[in-house]
Amino acid sequence: AINVLKIRGSHGLVGNDAIGGPRFLFMSTIRTQGQSYYFGDDQELLAGMEENAIGNTDVTWEKARKSNIGIDLGLFNSRVTLQADVFKEQRRDILLQRGTVASVAGFFPWSIPFANLGKVTNKGVDGLLEIKNTTSKGLFYSFRGNFTYAKNTVLENDEPAKRFSYLSGKGLALGQTLAFVADGFYQSAEEIAMSPKTFSTV
């Protein structure tokens, strides 16, 4: 018999101002000791002025829209209890330094502005199941287990177009490592000669 039944839910929008990056992102700055050039007959080396950082007055904090639905269930006078939650979080306006600005556009790498460009989604389920009882002789026992599944996906990271789709970080987990998968080791010279061409020498 069910003696506890509770359904929970929440939905909200929160901000995150701990977004990292340098201070005063809204300000453009000029560096007086910039690129150097030779001038005059004696070819004196003089430092020029250059754009040190390009400000962005539209920079704001990161935002997260979070939704959660959960259930608390107790059976047989709470001898069996279950807690389960399904959650989804959509983060947007993640602060990134632009990755699609080409160097031929006249920007130094350190002067490329920051902007709220990133989008990431997190979703998953987690739960807790507990079974407990006291025997007729006064022995108490309990078993508890939990489970969690979570998936993180990058929706937008302002990365430049990749030559091959597998090089893109979009659609993958945040910070996921990209690497080659090895099929094994060569065992003989004959095996090397019979194998397809690889990306490097052996």
Give residue ranges: language-model regions.
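Extracellular/periplasmic, surface-exposed regions of secreted and cell-surface proteins
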Residues: 1-181
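Alpha-helix N-cap recognition
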Residues: 188-189, 201
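Short, intrinsically disordered, charge-balanced linker/junction segments flanking boundaries
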Residues: 1, 196-202
